[in-house]
């Protein structure tokens, strides 16, 4: 496994891979890797000749400076995990390599609508940062496929739209959420939880399941369902942030013709903001 930190060296290897006709898969990450990331790597390995994992804590997508500072950086451990998985390349650039002139005045990629709704409304600029760094990685690495986790449901929808709108010839693969045995979705931010909070954390998944059962039963009193869910979360020790029930295919409000719903949930537990989602097929 080769660790690449500079753009010239990356371009040199990408040119060679293209000349050799290799099928390249990209797994973009911010590091602090867990089993959910490893599932992305496994999916990439099954679909391509060469797997490149990027590890870059992207300052452009953080809406709070304190969150950027405390985000876990575990490059050595990450590389050890990826080496065991027989990943071909790790691209781990410094911030100065990606943004040599700083963030002020930086050209960015914005996906209208999707970047400012739902999660984007509570985290201004976040999705603009995501779409910008992903487009930069696509331009640099020129992958045939790229793997993203379905845990970040809105992010995946945003990437798919950006790829379509910008005419990238890249297959976007969504990989299902990996959960702990108690239902908690794996996330790098779970590291912020204390031992006691970790015991409470699966409550978010349980509340989503309760919402799903109501939707499957035909209940469409969405505001009432959401209010009850928020109350349940608060009683469990969370601080409910945002719960939405949307059309899974458009992320717009549910209509009578919606075939699938997605429950999008975000809640604070101590210093950790946990997000999760669940899709439900609606009775027609």
Swiss-Prot record:
Top-tier EC class: ligase
Q: Under which pathway is this protein filed?
A: Cofactor biosynthesis; (R)-pantothenate biosynthesis; (R)-pantothenate from (R)-pantoate and beta-alanine: step 1/1
Q: Which residues are (R)-pantoate-binding?
A: 61, 155
Location of the active site: 37
- Reaction(s) catalysed (UniProt annotation): (R)-pantoate + beta-alanine + ATP = (R)-pantothenate + AMP + diphosphate + H(+)
Per the UniProt entry, the signal peptide is none
**Mostly located where?**
cytoplasm
Query: Is Nucleotide-binding included in the keywords of this UniProt record?
Result: yes
Query: Can you list the GO cellular component terms from the UniProt entry?
Result: cytosol
Disulfide bonding pattern of the chain? none
* GO MF entries: ATP binding; pantoate-beta-alanine ligase activity
Residue numbers binding ATP: 30-37, 149-152, 178, 186-189
Q: Where in the cell is it found?
A: Cytoplasm
Q: Which UniProt keywords apply?
A: ATP-binding, Cytoplasm, Ligase, Nucleotide-binding, Pantothenate biosynthesis
Other comments? The reaction proceeds by a bi uni uni bi ping pong mechanism.
- Which family is this sequence assigned to? Belongs to the pantothenate synthetase family.
Instruction: Name it.
Output: Pantothenate synthetase
Q: Which organism is it from?
A: Salmonella heidelberg (strain SL476)
- Gene name, please? panC
């Amino acid at each position: 496994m080769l660790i690449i930190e500079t753009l010239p060296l990356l371009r040199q290897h990408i040119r060679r891979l293209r000349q050799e006709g290799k099928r390249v898969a990209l797994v973009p990450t911010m590091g602090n890797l867990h089993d959910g990331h490893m599932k992305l790597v496994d999916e990439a390995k099954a679909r391509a000749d060469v797997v490149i994992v990027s590890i870059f804590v992207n300052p452009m997508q953080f809406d709070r400076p304190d969150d950027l500072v405390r985000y876990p950086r575990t490059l050595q451990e990450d590389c050890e995990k990826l080496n065991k998985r027989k990943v071909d390349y790790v691209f781990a650039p410094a911030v100065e390599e990606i943004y040599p002139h700083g963030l002020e005045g930086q050209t960015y990629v914005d996906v209208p609508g999707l970047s400012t709704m739902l999660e984007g409304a509570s985290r201004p600029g976040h999705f603009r940062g995501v779409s910008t760094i992903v487009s930069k990685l696509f331009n640099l690495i020129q992958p045939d496929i790229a793997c993203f986790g379905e845990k970040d449901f809105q992010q995946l929808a945003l990437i798919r739209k950006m790829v379509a709108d910008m005419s990238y010839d890249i297959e976007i693969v969504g990989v299902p959420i990996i959960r702990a045995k108690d239902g908690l979705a794996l996330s790098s931010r779970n590291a912020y939880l204390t031992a006691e909070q970790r015991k409470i954390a699966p409550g978010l998944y349980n509340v989503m399941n309760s919402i799903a059962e109501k939707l499957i039963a035909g209940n469409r009193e969405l505001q009432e369902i959401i209010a009850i869910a928020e109350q349940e979360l608060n009683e469990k020790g969370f601080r409910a942030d945002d719960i939405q029930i949307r059309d899974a295919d458009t992320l717009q409000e549910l209509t009578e013709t919606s075939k699938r719903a997605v429950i999008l949930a975000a809640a604070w537990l101590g210093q950790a903001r946990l997000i999760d989602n669940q899709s439900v097929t609606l009775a027609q």
